């Protein structure tokens, strides 16, 4: 548990969030409000709704239980206005705890069941981010589009093209800044998505890959060698391969460390140190990230405090300063107020 002094210092620290999912970060009260608006009543109270959205202690340890918490938000994020609304709420919550640079990530394909196209789904998130940016002057915002592994390489290529169409460097507003694959790793190795990543690279999007969270170190190697990853999401498996650590350090490939989430999903076993310290000792750059603020009952201050218990407060402050150099957000448009959606 962080001291009050440490928490206050971290709250004032300009923080950089490079790995946060929209679906798992919608404030519970916003989901509850929209559920009631649509007369959806899976539970009777907000307190009960929280237990459905937030991972409970007895549920920790498996990725399946963790991902199941995304089920209820999907009920209400199939409509443009709702997606924009929840995105605004997420940005507001991040700003409230001192996040200065925020990259949200989002899988548009799973928000198309009520008729939105993937492009409209992407635009809905960007609309929410642009509206929120007007309230938070100086906050840097960008969106990473996710292709889900289980949907296959062809859909990933389609989404890469859709992402490029809304790329930040093509618009004078908050836009898409990166491309990612997520979802079940086992049976879906990164090499299958090489063509999609080549499209994203040619479109000047930043490249990050969920790898080594629930799969062996080979998947991290593939993300680096075959997909050209500039950042690795989670990357827990990499810590056991000295050669890979040297490669990550040499090429300054950032590991997006999500401490609470890694323990919650079982990627790191309870009672064992998080690999963030080993990454730093090997010279691998790290970013301290929330993953899913609602599911993991966390925020950037809490994650930073948790990391401070592993690596020390000064190292946490240094990590946030260094992470700014690895954001995919383009500086020439990052702070410009939007005139449109």
Could you tell me what each predicted segment is?
Residues 1-205, 213-222, 226-231, 237-254, ...:
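Metal-cofactor-binding active-site regions of metalloenzymes
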């Amino acid at each position: 548990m962080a001291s009050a002094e440490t928490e206050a210092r971290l709250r004032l620290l300009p923080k950089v969030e490079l790995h946060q999912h929209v679906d798992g970060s919608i404030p519970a009260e916003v989901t509850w409000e929209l559920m009631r608006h649509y007369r959806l009543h899976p539970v009777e109270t907000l307190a009960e709704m929280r237990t459905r959205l937030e991972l409970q202690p007895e549920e920790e340890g498996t990725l399946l239980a963790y991902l199941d918490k995304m089920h209820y938000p999907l009920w209400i994020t199939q409509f443009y206005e709702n997606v924009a609304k929840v995105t605004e709420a997420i940005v507001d919550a991040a700003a409230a705890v001192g996040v200065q640079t925020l990259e949200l990530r989002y899988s548009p394909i799973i928000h198309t069941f009520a008729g939105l196209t993937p492009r409209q789904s992407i635009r809905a998130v960007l609309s929410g981010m642009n509206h929120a940016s007007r309230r938070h002057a100086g906050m840097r915002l960008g969106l990473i589009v996710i292709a889900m592994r289980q949907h296959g390489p062809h859909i990933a290529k389609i989404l890469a093209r859709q992402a490029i169409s809304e790329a930040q460097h093509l618009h004078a507003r908050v836009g898409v800044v990166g491309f990612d694959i997520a979802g079940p790793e086992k049976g879906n190795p990164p090499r299958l998505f090489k063509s999609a990543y080549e499209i994203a690279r040619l479109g000047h999007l930043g490249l990050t890959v969920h790898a080594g969270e629930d799969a062996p170190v080979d998947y991290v190697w593939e993300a680096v060698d075959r997909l050209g990853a500039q950042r690795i999401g989670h990357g827990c498996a990499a810590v056991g391969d000295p050669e890979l650590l040297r490669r990550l350090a040499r090429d300054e490939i950032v590991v997006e460390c999500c401490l609470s989430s890694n323990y919650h999903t079982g990627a790191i076993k309870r009672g064992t140190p998080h690999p963030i310290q080993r990454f730093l000792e090997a010279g691998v750059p790290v970013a301290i990230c929330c993953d899913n603020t609602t599911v993991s009952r966390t925020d950037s201050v809490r994650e930073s405090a948790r990391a401070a218990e592993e690596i020390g407060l000064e190292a946490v402050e240094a990590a946030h300063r260094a992470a700014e150099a690895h954001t995919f957000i383009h500086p020439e448009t990052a702070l410009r107020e939007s005139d449109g959606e």
